[in-house]
């Protein structure tokens, strides 16, 4: 009788152990897919699992074997794609092992996004590339030779912004130039737009001299008052709000893209990229600067462990 009892207890303990191990493994696999990735100059790629503890030990500093500067990064279709100078395109399925892809050109690339089952990359001299998988790329005709800097997808439309340029496309292949009353002459720095996003049924584009444009459809654009003259580099819509970052530590928030409030970032360093995930905003910038915030209002500087220029950040969901 006691032998049967001991056997039952032993089997019960074994079963509990197996369930516990399976649960831990499942939690581990889940957390590994939700990661912040930041990119920067000299081929810098950084990782963080939570966006909160940004120390040199938590950051996993990687280099895929090149000194080329990286300008932007996105995540889609279970694939990371990062772009940079000299038409650099690299991709990874896990964020750890990266492969350089052949774009066939030598212009610098500035922005990348994923939408409508397509990766779209933009860059200097009107450069646009598309890919369905992040590996094989095709050059598209943009209809312009101006610099293209930022790209976003929303409401069935890609929107590209650049130097005195706004382009739209439904598929990433065929593009149409949209009219806007740019400052004269067109070469003025205030016509340089660098970031764009979509949210709350509105496209928002940000640029130098604190300029902000909004549009309901990507075609008709209206200028808004930002409240700053600092250059703005990037903008996102997350957690019900727009959030823009820029030079001298500038951070702006808005519920609708029209009314903007400047927030105290606690730094004067230029900020280039921003992302949101795990209920945390992460902004990156010059000299390895990383800031985090739970609400976009209160910001804390974190230790990246590096001094490289950071240009972009994304969160994999």
Regions found by a protein language model. Give the residues of each.
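Bacterial N-terminal signal peptides that target proteins for export
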Residues: 1-8
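Bacterial Sec-dependent N-terminal signal peptides
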Residues: 2, 14-35
């Amino acid at each position: 009788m006691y032998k049967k009892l001991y056997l039952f207890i032993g089997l019960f303990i074994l079963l509990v152990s197996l369930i516990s191990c399976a649960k831990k493994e499942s939690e581990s696999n889940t957390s590994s897919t939700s990661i912040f990735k930041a990119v920067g100059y000299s081929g810098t790629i950084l990782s963080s699992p939570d966006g909160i503890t940004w120390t040199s030990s938590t950051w996993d500093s990687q280099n895929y074997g090149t000194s080329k500067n990286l300008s932007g990064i996105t995540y889609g279709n279970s694939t990371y794609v990062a772009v940079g100078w000299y038409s650099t395109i690299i991709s990874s399925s896990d964020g750890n092992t990266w492969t350089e892809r052949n774009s066939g050109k030598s212009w610098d690339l500035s922005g990348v996004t994923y939408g409508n089952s397509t990766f779209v990359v933009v860059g200097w001299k009107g450069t646009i590339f598309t890919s369905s998988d992040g590996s094989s790329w095709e050059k598209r005709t943009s209809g312009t030779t101006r610099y293209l800097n930022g790209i976003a997808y929303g409401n069935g439309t890609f929107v590209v912004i650049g130097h005195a340029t706004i382009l739209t496309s439904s598929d990433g292949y065929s593009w149409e130039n949209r009219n806007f009353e740019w400052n004269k002459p067109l070469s003025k720095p205030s016509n340089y737009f660098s970031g764009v996003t979509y949210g709350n049924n509105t496209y928002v584009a940000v640029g130098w001299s604190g300029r902000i444009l909004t549009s309901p459809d990507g075609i008709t654009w209206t200028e808004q008052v930002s409240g700053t003259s600092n250059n703005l580099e990037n903008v996102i819509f997350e957690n019900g709000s727009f959030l823009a970052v820029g030079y001298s530590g500038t951070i702006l928030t808005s519920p609708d893209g029209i009314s903007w409030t400047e927030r105290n970032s606690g730094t004067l360093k230029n900020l280039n990229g921003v992302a949101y995930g795990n209920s945390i905003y992460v902004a990156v910038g010059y000299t390895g600067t990383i800031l985090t915030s739970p609400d976009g209002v209160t910001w804390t500087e974190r230790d990246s462990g590096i001094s490289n220029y950071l240009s972009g950040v994304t969160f994999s969901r």
